[in-house]
């Protein structure tokens, strides 16, 4: 049965369906490896780890029940055990003690459990339940605060051969590679909210309208416009011209009722230039009453420097003085507020929004705070093996979906290269002609030969370009998937298992962030707080159960510095006051540290 297997009777009973899933049973142990991860259990539970029980099931014939599997996956993620294969390098009995069993699931067993859960296809519903849990209103929370969400796509490169994926541009490697795109929604603190997977080469605005907004509308975050009562107390922000002198007055087209100033937006989406499209912005407001905030594209003019003023802006909880100016503009017949930041180099960064409720400094702070989402991606890639494939296999995509014809794309690429070749030859010919003007008369015949040779090559290149152009004219630009040849037809990697693991990692990241924020209140610096959380997770701990009083005491060993130990002591006191019970038991958890 494997190393550290001691509960053989329970395993046999579970196998024959008589005993059910194994219940946690703790024994006294000193110096359990990674025992500090139990300090994050209250945060994991508060972030909704056991919400999974409302949707997923594991049959009673399995020794490892749902709680045990969830705790194993969560503790693995927090301990930076990045995939089941790495369990081979760990002590199975040590991790087993953390979940109250004799040992951790074996690699194949854990993969089977992940496959079993993924086959139930509840990942998106689980994500929505967690959103309702994370952002449920409470008595102390100000529900009048406007909702802002960051949205961005994360490209996950695929190096395998089983799936036939379309090529996407990967900015990290500056190459076009076979990949899938995950679209993430984060809140203003950078915490993950929602995630959807793109099937083909969808644009960001397509993912927002087709997947993200429908998912959000099924949560408490984004009610439909008809469900949202309009408050008479909501007032738009002060006019832009009162902030900065010299601003432009709105034109007649802007002053019409088309301007979204009368109603507060249900939500403001913040994204980069990838989703820049004026009709898309207009649809978001008209159809969903959603405002947008993004960078403006194709800015060709510069505003007068004397229009800018130094304004204190809060970016990610830090006060920064920015040189800002705001004007009202009309783009494509649609009114917007344009805010520009003047940098020390003289560059003007342009931001546009149709949210009339927020101030200039709020708009700038939220736009430039978008890097918290990029920091989230970078942290997850480095610490949680964000791009790791969970399950091998592919599945078909709706054959009615349209894609760019691969033959059209190939011809288009050849046309581009042929045109570049022609331009290079023409530039070379121009250089020879200019040189010939200063060449002695007796050397002109040699130059003439070179000119004739280049002219011949240019004519041949132009003829080839014309042939390719005519060939492309006979090819349909877009085709449906069913019209693609079988070997070239696009499919997709199975998304359910990756989505489920992403949700578990969301919970872990939010739990880790919650503990890190508590540590910062106890004297740990912002630069060190996540490092201290990792140190707590990696540290050993003593486990002492008390069956008479139904308590489970977790004693963390000393950390690397006295100030960290002081913070850990205060954290232990707070965690104990939460009255957390270990899942599937009646044992109240008590947290202590060995440091004096």
Q: What are these model-derived regions, one by one?
A:
Residues 1-175, 180-262, 463-596:
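Dynamic "connector" segments at or just before major functional cores
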Residues 160-162, 277-286, 302-307:
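A short acidic (Asp/Glu
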Residues 262-263, 281-291:
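Short, surface-exposed basic-aromatic patches at helix termini and helix-loop junctions that form
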Residues 269-279, 298-301:
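Acidic, metal-coordinating catalytic cores used for nucleic-acid/nucleotide bond scission
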Residues 291, 359, 367-403, 461-468, ...:
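C-terminal, active-site-flanking charged/polar segments
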Residues 380-434:
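Charged, amphipathic alpha-helical linkers/stalks
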Residues 425-472, 476-479:
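Extended alpha-helical coiled-coil "stalk/arm" regions
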